[in-house]
Amino acid sequence: MKKITIWHTNDVHSQFEDFSLIVSYIREHVNIEKDFLLDAGDFCDQKSVMINGTHGVGGIELLKSAGYDAMAIGNNEFFAGMEYLEEMTNQNFPLLSANLFRLNKEPISGVLPFITLTRSGVRVLIIGISPYWGESPESTAFTDMCGMKLLEPTSLVQKILEQEKGNYDISILLSHGGIKKDREIAETVNGLDCIIGGHSHTEMDEAEHINGTWIHQSGCWAKYLGKLTLEVDDDYHVVSASGENIVVEKEKDPQIESVMAQQTEIAIAELSKVLYVLPQDLEFSIEHECMAMNVLADMMWKTYPSDLALINHGILSKGISREVTKLNLLEVSPSPLNLTTVVWSGKQIKDAILASQKNEYIHMTSNRWSGFRGTELGTIAVSYNVEVNCDLQIIKIDGIPLDEEKCYRVITSDFLQRGSGYEMLGGSLKETNFAKEYFRDLLEMKLNDLQLIESAQVIRFHRGI
């Protein structure tokens, strides 16, 4: 009987301070000559100054320093675009995805569908997959914008297992597909020994056994180091397996801290270059109409054809200083949310605007909001062609009273389009269009338009009249 130990992380999302603690544990307990050390994706989150300023390269340097064998490509690795991804794949470290391609289905330079590693005489095939959301227009919108194509992974995994038969003894799927997809693959694919999962942030105290395949996943945010131990007989059949998630209580790893410091210095130097200087600071409030949010709403409306702009204040975290840099904009708008054009009814718009005057919405918080970076939901900002009488609950668009039965084209975020926070806005897929730009990208492109600073002084929310 042989023991094969797979140590793993997933969905670290740039929580590198906690990752440093995990690496201290790895240095003590992982036998790099015998064990396997894998990450199941979403390690590099663009909210990080280091990741943003090094185009993800800083994250790869951390994985290399920690002794990782490979990483599956998660959505946060490719959402920043092809240029960023190819910089990461050019760092002499295995980034795996068998189902991520260019839009024309050609391979992406440096992306590997699988690798085979030999430890203690055992040949282990490691296949990677990225998240697959389906083929509908709304499902493919983000990858289309990135110039990429995701294919359904199940048949691809089966094909690789059959194609490589005889070249490996044990097979691992390193999956950023989420627990639901992992279970589907385990049910369907023959000859797969185990799945190390990610994407769904699932905390699995024990490994799950489906159709001869063992599945394990370790939550998120570097809270745990996962450990999956396989018992293998002389014919390389997995006889049993055990999984655990280890809470690490160690000191930070000095080597990781040094790499972080070096890469962060590179990032800050790149991001701190002054782009331009505004005539004034743009103040921010989570509760009240403010210059920063008025400017943002106006530039949204002016840039994307729509009847109005509507966005929650929680999309920003602070005001915008006169000296505009990429670093400042990342701090102001760390969210990876995209500009999104939707069609909402007048009633949906009115209900959301009126709800946004209530504290239970303004100060709402929730850990389940995917991609949401603000600490609170915030009130709602609108473009200057919208006039709201808060006392009389009258809303006008271009001077005409809002018609609750009419459909309006609105530029907003994919966060609000999903009905996150302001639940009355959810469910709109009719004529929905996603823009490639993040909100900080739009700010960078348009903040030097002084007419927007002027229009931002137009009051939209009126009381006492």
Regions found by a protein language model. Give the residues of each.
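Acidic, metal/ion-coordinating pockets
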Residues: 1-247, 289-299, 309
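Glycine- and acidic
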Residues: 8-10, 280-283, 337-338, 424-425
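Feature captures C-terminal
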Residues: 15-18, 320-465
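Structural signal for hydrophobic packing residues in well-ordered secondary-structure cores
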Residues: 26-30, 89, 161-168, 179, ...
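A short, polar/proline- and glycine-enriched secondary-structure boundary/capping micro-motif
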Residues: 135-139, 227, 250-258, 320-321, ...
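Structural motif
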Residues: 175, 313, 412-414
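Charge-rich, low-complexity terminal tails
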Residues: 194, 218, 225-226, 299-305, ...
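A short C-terminal boundary segment appended to hydrolase-like catalytic domains
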Residues: 233-324, 447-465
